[in-house]
């Protein structure tokens, strides 16, 4: 299991921002900046149909595209984001970004992931947005390969830390929907849980430990959710698989600090998933906080219309990856 960190009690007080609020550099949503991009490259062959068009990457940061983090034999790649003119000898914290899509769909370069990566990179982080094994063929079993891929991403960033200018001891993760599930698996599972030592998986001699994790609107208790195609079995047929794929069952006091963000208007993954996770986390002594966003639906990035989440997310990562003291007020004003 993973090493505990300081509690977040002071991090999430619900008041308007003050002069103490951590500064967040202004950046327009990435999806609205197509005209500002100098380059546009076609999506890879594994990209879902909705992304079979040119991907417009931000020009405010440096992007290294389609890095073979799983080895040359795997089609799933990663994009590495770093600040412009970043001196690799000056190490920055790293953040793994994991897309959603129900474990069947999604891509590292969708608008949500571009938004998250650009905003966090502008705050002084090196981000690695990954593709991982998805279920694209009927009856195909893709779990636990998705978990192995997420752990391999952490190992790869740690392995290549000097090349990317990353502090190998300061790596966090953020994921949305299915990516939230994987982010929480990274925060809660360790060597005794069966995911860390796997034959033929890369970088087995390197730790997949993360220092902290953020999860947006994810299913974290699968046995109490619905049947998942990635298992190719129903909950009735294979309840143990669903339990093993649920980070709620690995919670304990040694887990990395976790922040969940969930909207009250989510009809895809109910808010009760995050509420149940928080309840068990408290019972087990895990360091977990839940931020509820009124009227927010299932899918949003760091800048939903309901509220600017950049101060919240930045403050969490700054505390656990940069050692900054959390302030009492970090919320941006909620939209009217």
Regions of interest found by a model, annotated:
Residues 41-90:
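N-terminal cap/lid segment of alpha/beta-hydrolase-fold proteins
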Residues 86-92, 98-140, 181, 193-195, ...:
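Short substrate-entry loop that stabilizes the transition state in hydrolases
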Residues 152-227, 242:
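Primarily recognizes the serine-hydrolase "nucleophile elbow" in alpha/beta-hydrolase
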Residues 198-202, 236-250, 256:
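Active-site nucleophile elbow and catalytic-triad environment of alpha/beta-hydrolase enzymes
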Residues 254, 260-262, 266:
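Short beta-strand/loop motif that positions the catalytic acidic residue
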């Amino acid at each position: 299991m993973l090493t505990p960190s300081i509690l977040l009690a002071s991090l999430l007080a619900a008041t308007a921002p003050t002069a103490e609020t951590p500064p967040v550099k202004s950046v327009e949503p990435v999806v609205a900046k197509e005209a500002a991009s100098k380059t546009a490259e076609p999506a890879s062959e594994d990209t879902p149909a909705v992304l079979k068009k040119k991907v417009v990457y931000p020009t405010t940061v440096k992007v290294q595209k389609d890095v073979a983090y799983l080895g040359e034999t795997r089609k799933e790649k990663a994009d590495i984001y770093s600040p412009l003119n970043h001196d690799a000898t000056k190490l920055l914290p790293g953040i793994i970004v994991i897309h959603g899509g129900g474990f069947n769909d999604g891509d590292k370069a969708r608008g949500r992931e571009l938004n998250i990566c650009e905003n966090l990179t502008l705050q002084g982080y090196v981000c690695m947005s990954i593709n991982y094994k998805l279920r694209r063929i009927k009856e195909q079993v893709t779990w636990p390969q998705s978990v192995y891929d997420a752990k391999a991403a952490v190992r790869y960033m740690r392995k290549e830390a000097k090349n990317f200018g990353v502090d190998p001891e300061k790596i966090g993760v953020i994921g949305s929907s299915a990516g939230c599930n994987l982010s929480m698996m990274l925060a809660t599972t360790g060597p005794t849980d069966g995911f860390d030592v796997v034959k033929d998986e890369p970088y087995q001699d390197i730790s997949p430990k993360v220092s902290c994790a953020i999860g947006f609107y994810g299913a974290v208790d699968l046995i109490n959710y619905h049947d998942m195609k990635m298992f190719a079995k129903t909950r009735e047929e294979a309840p143990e698989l669903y339990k093993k794929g649920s980070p709620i069952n690995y919670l304990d006091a040694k887990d990395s600090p976790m922040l969940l963000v969930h909207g009250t208007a989510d009809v895809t993954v109910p808010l009760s998933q995050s509420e149940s996770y928080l309840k068990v986390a408290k019972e087990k002594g895990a360091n977990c906080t839940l931020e509820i966003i009124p009227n927010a639906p299932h899918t949003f990035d760091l800048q939903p219309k309901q509220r600017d989440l950049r101060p919240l997310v930045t403050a969490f990562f700054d505390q656990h990856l940069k050692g900054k003291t959390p302030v009492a007020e970090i919320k941006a004003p909620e939209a009217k």
